[in-house]
């Protein structure tokens, strides 16, 4: 049972209480032992992972927060849990860090799954975040498209300049050849005059 001291449910509740009391290190210790037990017994590690992600979020350790959100999201997906929070929390975190493409992919997936299992509360939470990420993602795509067009134009202009430069060089070489021939002809004529 959840309330039996030493049970996984009890330990998870204890860790939540410790997080609330800002005893993060103690909470992490309990959550890590739960994580290990869940792993050894073949249970889903989603719940201890989200707990660890929350603990590291409180401590300001974004890298470990991301790591455990990802582990929790993967565990949820493997367990075919459709009403998960890890993935959209990870999407939000990635969005804040500027990883728009992955944030967009994860939030879309979260929305589809929340809609699929008719999770009204979760859908509402996600739908507040989805338009923001969507808009930013679309703007990023537009920006990339604009940069691509600018790059194509710049490349075209450079090619035209290169062609003009090559034509100019070719024209100058032709003129040089004509001048060289004229000089050679004059030299030959001078030789004839001198030999006479």
Task: Label each region the model flagged.
Residues 138-194:
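Alpha-helical transmembrane signal-anchor helices
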Residues 122, 129, 186, 193-196:
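Alpha-helical structural motif
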Residues 1-142:
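A "functional boundary" signal
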